[in-house]
């Protein structure tokens, strides 16, 4: 199994986008993949050009300048790659090109020219993550790098989540990485108990033991270096996972695009959305089709 054969990397020339392009080149080199850089420019309505004739000449000069910036931005990477400039709405063009080129994964920044976009629903990245049929790898500011040494694979114990495992295992073998298979036990009943009920504490302990045993059995013959991590968090699953990222020195998170119910609208206040927004490392979300 080859992790990724074709990688689509949208760029808007922001600092985060430059980091993303570098990460995409590293991934393409590791996977021997074709890399497609995409820049989506705003479209000037034709009727405006007829009203102000000089506008058409300005757009033409701007396109030439854009090509020069794009060539510099893509770097001198010698691998198989392509540069595409399209016009339109960014998320629509990214999704269209992903389908048209049959990309296996879209690698894009957590935020673009707007530094607050990552905290708002409706940003380009979140629209792409919601709607893309292929995997989406979201890169955050900081020091994203490959090869990854520690991969975090969160699971809700469902068969749907475990369909992501073959890709996780392939990436672990590719990077010679260790995988932390993690499950967060979230018992909402514990959050509002004052004082804490000891019987609920016992239930939590028994659940941790049972979940650990189930995961150990499930991944016993995985063939990759892995560790089972089961923790109980009262703050919720999303915050619990982002805490694990720091504790486990995670370089890459790989998780399904939604949880136990694949028919539910993904990323509307869900766990995966919170992780994509707030994690300090790249997050690869994978959607499985029935």
Predicted region positions:
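A short acidic, glycine-rich active-site loop
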Residues: 54-68, 199-211
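Small/aliphatic-rich secondary-structure junction motif
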Residues: 1-54, 150-201, 220-224, 278, ...
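Active-site phosphate/pyrophosphate- and oxyanion-stabilizing loops and adjacent acidic/basic residues
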Residues: 25, 71, 126, 169, ...
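Gly/Ser-rich helix-loop-strand patches that form or flank binding pockets
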Residues: 3, 26, 30, 95-144, ...
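Structural beta-alpha unit
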Residues: 1-2, 23, 53-57, 72-106, ...
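Short beta->alpha linker loops
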Residues: 65, 85-89, 143, 185, ...
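General small-molecule cofactor/ligand-binding pocket signal
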Residues: 36-38, 82-86, 137, 180-182, ...
């Amino acid at each position: 199994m080859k992790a990724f054969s074709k990688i689509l990397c949208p760029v808007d020339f922001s600092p985060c986008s430059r980091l993303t392009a570098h990460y995409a080149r590293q991934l393409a080199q590791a996977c021997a993949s074709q890399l497609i850089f995409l820049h989506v420019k705003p479209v000037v309505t034709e009727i405006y050009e007829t009203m102000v004739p000089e506008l058409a000449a300005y757009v033409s000069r701007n396109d030439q300048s854009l090509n020069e910036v794009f060539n510099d931005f893509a770097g001198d990477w010698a691998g198989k790659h392509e540069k595409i400039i399209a016009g339109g709405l960014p998320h629509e063009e990214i999704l269209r090109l992903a389908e048209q080129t049959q990309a296996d994964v879209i690698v894009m920044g957590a935020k673009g020219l707007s530094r607050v976009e990552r905290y708002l629903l409706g940003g380009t990245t979140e629209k792409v993550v919601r709607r893309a049929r292929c995997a989406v790898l979201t890169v955050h500011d900081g020091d994203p790098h490959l090869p990854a040494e520690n991969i975090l694979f969160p699971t809700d114990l469902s068969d749907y989540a475990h369909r992501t495992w073959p890709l996780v295992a392939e990436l672990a073998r590719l990077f010679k990485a260790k995988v932390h298979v993690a499950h967060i036990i979230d018992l909402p009943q514990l959050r509002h108990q004052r004082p804490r009920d000891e019987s609920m504490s016992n239930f939590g302990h028994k659940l941790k033991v049972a979940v650990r045993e189930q995961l150990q059995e499930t991944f016993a013959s995985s063939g990759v270096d892995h560790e089972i991590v089961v923790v109980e968090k009262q703050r919720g699953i999303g915050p619990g996972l982002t805490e694990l990222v720091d504790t486990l020195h995670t370089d890459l998170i790989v998780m399904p695009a939604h949880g136990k119910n694949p028919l539910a609208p993904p990323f509307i206040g869900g766990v995966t959305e919170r992780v994509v927004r707030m994690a300090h490392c790249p997050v690869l979300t994978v959607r499985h089709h029935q």
